[in-house]
Amino acid sequence: MTKKEQALIEQYAKSLVQVCQERDTLEALQADVLAILEVFKATNLAKTLSSLAVPRAKKLELVRQLQGDNIIYLNNFLEVMLQNEREAYLYQVLLRVLSELASVSNQYDVTVTSAVPLSEEQKQRVRTVVSKRLAVKTGRLIEKVDPSLIGGFMISVNNKVIDTSIRRQLQAFKMNLK
């Protein structure tokens, strides 16, 4: 992706988030964007919208089906993207909208990788640790299981990592022995 395309995607995303922030509809925007992204993940929609082989009329129909019960600002935004023939960038723009929302609200997705699945109590403790140590609000808690950690966990938030895994401790111990 070129710098020009990245700037275009960023500008569209920032504009939508700014409008929704002014209208105090950020939570509704986030819910609607997540729902649309689920459609993208469940289908080949991103490839279809960026394909030159698919007629423009079909692309318009597909994007208009996404509008549904979304907040008016998102539906208007989708129309603007169609009018400007930017539907090929829709998936990347929506992903960027989520990162802009996280930045504006200081609420980030937290990825927790552990050797075994976490209990609800442990998930709550992770949220507390993240808010205290990293000074961010917890968005979605994304849980991954990786038995190679042996024990402990890794928390990743906004490009920051807390690694208390036994695997890392063993690696550090090995390095100290050299």
Curated annotation (Swiss-Prot):
PANTHER family: ATP SYNTHASE DELTA CHAIN
Membrane topology: Peripheral membrane protein
Protein name as it appears in the record: ATP synthase subunit delta
UniProt-listed HAMAP family: ATP_synth_delta_bact (MF_01416)
UniProt function note: F(1)F(0) ATP synthase produces ATP from ADP in the presence of a proton or sodium gradient. F-type ATPases consist of two structural domains, F(1) containing the extramembraneous catalytic core and F(0) containing the membrane proton channel, linked together by a central stalk and a peripheral stalk. During catalysis, ATP synthesis in the catalytic domain of F(1) is coupled via a rotary mechanism of the central stalk subunits to proton translocation.
Lineage: Bacteria, Bacillati, Bacillota, Bacilli, Lactobacillales
Family to which the UniProt record says this protein belongs: Belongs to the ATPase delta chain family.
Compartmental location: Cell membrane
GO cellular component terms listed in the entry, alphabetical order: plasma membrane; proton-transporting ATP synthase complex
Record keywords, A-Z: ATP synthesis, Cell membrane, CF(1), Hydrogen ion transport, Ion transport, Membrane, Transport
Complex formation: F-type ATPases have 2 components, F(1) - the catalytic core - and F(0) - the membrane proton channel. F(1) has five subunits: alpha(3), beta(3), gamma(1), delta(1), epsilon(1). F(0) has three main subunits: a(1), b(2) and c(10-14). The alpha and beta chains form an alternating ring which encloses part of the gamma chain. F(1) is attached to F(0) by a central stalk formed by the gamma and epsilon chains, while a peripheral stalk is formed by the delta and b chains.
Organism: Streptococcus equi subsp. zooepidemicus (strain MGCS10565)
Main location per the UniProt record: membrane
Example GO molecular function: proton-transporting ATP synthase activity, rotational mechanism
